[in-house]
Amino acid sequence: MDRRIFGIETEYGVTCAAPDGRGLSADEVARYLFRKVVAWGRSSNVFLRNGSRLYLDVGSHPEYATAECDDVRQLVTYDKGGERILEGLVADAQQRLEHEGLPGTVHLFKNNTDSAGNSYGCHENYLVRRQGDFARLSDILVPFLITRQVLVGAGKVLATPRGAVYCLSQRADHIWEAVSSATTRSRPIINTRDEPHADAEYFRRLHVIVGDSSMAEPTTMLKVGATDLVLRLVEAGVIMRDLSLENPIRAIREISHDRTGTHAVQLADGRTMTAVDIQGEYFRRVREHVDAHGINDADPSPTTKAVLDLWERGLHALESGDLSSVDRELDWVIKLRLIERYQAKHGLELDDPRIARLDLAYHDISRTEGLYNLLAARGMVERVTTDLEILESTAVPPPTTRAKLRGDFVRAAQDARRDYTVDWVHLKLNDQAQRTVLCKDPFRSVDERVDRLIESM
């Protein structure tokens, strides 16, 4: 595909900590978080002026789905914009709690597991063409998605009967199938439920649910950018060596529990390879393809070059055992370094409760309390986007995709105080005429029908 539509859906963990331990339940906190949203949107499921969707998911998890983006860097920006929007909800909820004399501090975490062992997700969406063999696409992608955690995992301190261990991925231990149409019951790597949110005759949405939520901007860039490049490889018809794993679910756990990336996993054909070897094979094939053909016969963009550079440096760091070249860019390495410094300073074992609190605090989206955000404020991690672009993304839709039509419509309807209904493909004025515009092309940012609908308000 010359252009691809990307989107990220992030479920956030929520808690209300009180000094006496009697904080509000997650359900109660979620209601406070969404009071303001329900007040103006009459629902806890709304589309925003920036084209994104904000809603309360199953299990009291606030969820933010980015607007459609057609550029990886743009997606990183809108993903971060979601954090800022949710941070605003936290501030409002905190104010309401204090006004009502209720104790406790509300925290939102961009992570994937809670202390009770529940898991919530970060789902990546990639638009692919309907034509082509989706089963082949999935077969080639699964080993890549299982092994990419050595680079883009969020890191996690896991308590085991033999003591605490530092794992690469928060999500790996909660995945039960390679490919399935379910998202919660079996938690597959790729979800096959066919909801393209586009013209189903031409497009299909690849729904990847195995990934961890990322705090570090370069990690998000690599996670989505490398997956896009592998998809382009498949779409170009490049023949890949079969890297199918004998037992994908066992492999994803074993890889997560070995932070060196050197644990050998069994392939379906009887060979054994390490996660780094498998990732290296994908990287080399992608690099060869980009060097030979560019990206769709165009020169690689600065973002593509940055993705390839970080992918290569990450693999070299794992091969050499020296992670210093990526300890400002990859989440699991940034957090590991933070934990190691804290352990050394205070003489702590990995299973100390203070380490668990630090692990969690890394993912707090607060810019004043979240450890990742404090590192970013001090210039201790690398950036992909800017604070100004992130701020703009909270209010303005991406200008190059269907999200602009949706965002402009929502803004106009709200300003005109008109009753309206929107979803990913429909824009509707709830007046006597019930006028509706169907927007099936996610690449289209200009539409005379939408212009007329807005002018009629």
UniProtKB/Swiss-Prot annotation:
The keyword rRNA-binding does not apply. Keywords: ATP-binding, Ligase, Magnesium, Metal-binding, Nucleotide-binding, Ubl conjugation pathway. ATP binds at residues 53, 66, 424. It holds the Pfam family Pup_ligase. Its EC number is 6.3.1.19. Pathway: Protein degradation; proteasomal Pup-dependent pathway; Protein modification; protein pupylation. GO terms for molecular function: ATP binding; ligase activity, forming carbon-nitrogen bonds; magnesium ion binding; ubiquitin-like protein transferase activity. It comes from the Bacteria. The active site is at 57 (proton acceptor). InterPro entries: Pup_ligase (IPR022279), Pup_ligase/deamidase (IPR004347). The keyword Metal-binding applies. It catalyses: ATP + [prokaryotic ubiquitin-like protein]-L-glutamate + [protein]-L-lysine = ADP + phosphate + N(6)-([prokaryotic ubiquitin-like protein]-gamma-L-glutamyl)-[protein]-L-lysine. It is an enzyme of class 6 (ligase). Mg(2+) binds at residues 9, 55, 63. One of its GO terms (biological process) is protein pupylation. The reaction mechanism probably proceeds via the activation of Pup by phosphorylation of its C-terminal glutamate, which is then subject to nucleophilic attack by the substrate lysine, resulting in an isopeptide bond and the release of phosphate as a good leaving group. PANTHER family: PUP DEAMIDASE/DEPUPYLASE, PUP--PROTEIN LIGASE. Catalyzes the covalent attachment of the prokaryotic ubiquitin-like protein modifier Pup to the proteasomal substrate proteins, thereby targeting them for proteasomal degradation. This tagging system is termed pupylation. The ligation reaction involves the side-chain carboxylate of the C-terminal glutamate of Pup and the side-chain amino group of a substrate lysine. Belongs to the Pup ligase/Pup deamidase family. Pup-conjugating enzyme subfamily. This is Pup--protein ligase. It comes from Xylanimonas cellulosilytica (strain DSM 15894 / JCM 12276 / CECT 5975 / KCTC 9989 / LMG 20990 / NBRC 107835 / XIL07). The lineage of its organism: Bacteria, Bacillati, Actinomycetota, Actinomycetes, Micrococcales.
